[in-house]
Amino acid sequence: MASSSMSSQSSGSWTAKQNKAFEQALATYDQDTPNRWQNVAKVVGGKTTEEVKRHYELLVQDINSIENGHVPFPNYRTSGGCTNGRLSQEEKRMRNMRLQ
């Protein structure tokens, strides 16, 4: 019974808390650390060694895609009132600024 609850806990998406623990564990356990993925999985909690390793591999793929220009930059400009004119005011200020 414990294994079924563990597998349901470990499958699926990652919580923000798990992602933060994952980042911290990667900083603690570098690639030369023996049993790196087991240690990372222990810190993250609720994930298997294989899931942690796969999560890392996907992260590396995402970084490579971004660095190779395969991911377009987002367009944050809006046309309309959702920013209540703040963006255009900020743009005006930036245009009037002079670098010293």
From Swiss-Prot:
MF annotations from Gene Ontology: DNA-binding transcription factor activity
Keyword Nucleus annotated: yes
Cellular localization per UniProt: Nucleus
SMART domains from the UniProt entry: SANT (SM00717)
Main location: nucleus
Other notes: Assigned as a member of the MYB-related gene family, I-box-binding-like subfamily.
Protein name per its UniProtKB record: Protein RADIALIS-like 1
